[in-house]
């Protein structure tokens, strides 16, 4: 009913994923993440999205967030906490409340564009790029855990996966770092010193938390450089 109501208001789902659960009786009630786009945000190099999170077991209500999807790398980002987040409990007129929440997130798209354009206008030198990557590593791996240092380096996070990502603007550096952190596949060393490959982040909560933190890190650097 919620999806039907959102579709009727012009929001189209483009990606759905769900949390893996071991308990069979929880499987149909697991948390879902749905990335939706209004008709005005269908085309472009990157598009703004409304992200809908829901857990059907009643443990949490609906959560709506703003996000950006970048087509060239099929990368989905989540905007920082300064951009509207709407929570809708599983009570009352749920469908209408979720629709209202989606339009509230839509109102925040101008701020997303402003921050995104600001990042594209900022150029980072080599030291600044490494400082950004170092801070990003600390979001993913606990820097205080001396027994389990980060298995990869700043230079690995900054390595572009495609030619067009070799630019030095903050937005592109942010994209490279985010993609390498979340998609995994980087060769490194485990705690015991054995060769390993980093795993992609598949958990919904962990993915959203890291993505929001990375956005806030990038926006903080944008403000420092402005």
Residue ranges with predicted function:
Residues 17-41:
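Accessory recognition modules or surfaces
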Residues 20, 39-226:
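Intrinsically disordered, low-complexity regions enriched in serine/threonine
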Residues 1-17:
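Amphipathic alpha-helical segments
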């Amino acid at each position: 009913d919620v999806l039907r109501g959102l579709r009727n208001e012009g929001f189209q789902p483009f990606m759905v994923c769900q949390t893996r659960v071991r308990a069979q009786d929880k499987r149909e009630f697991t948390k879902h993440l749905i990335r939706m786009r209004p008709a005005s945000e269908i085309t472009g190099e990157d598009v703004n999205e409304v992200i809908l999170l829901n857990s059907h077991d009643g443990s949490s209500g609906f959560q709506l967030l703003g996000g950006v999807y970048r087509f060239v790398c099929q990368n989905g980002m989540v905007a920082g906490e300064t951009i509207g987040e709407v929570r809708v409990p599983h009570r009352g007129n749920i469908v209408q409340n979720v629709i209202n929440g989606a339009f509230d997130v839509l109102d925040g798209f101008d701020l997303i564009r402003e921050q995104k354009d600001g990042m594209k206008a900022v150029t980072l030198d080599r030291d600044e790029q490494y400082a950004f990557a170092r801070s990003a590593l600390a979001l993913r791996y606990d820097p205080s855990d001396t027994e389990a240092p980060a298995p990869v380096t700043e230079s690995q996070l900054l390595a572009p996966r495609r030619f067009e990502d070799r630019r030095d603007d903050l937005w592109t550096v942010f994209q490279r770092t985010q993609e390498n952190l979340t998609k995994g596949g980087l060769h490194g060393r485990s705690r015991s010193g054995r060769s390993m490959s980093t795993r992609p982040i598949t958990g919904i909560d962990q993915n959203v938390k890291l993505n929001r933190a990375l956005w806030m890190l990038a926006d903080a650097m944008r403000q420092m450089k402005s």
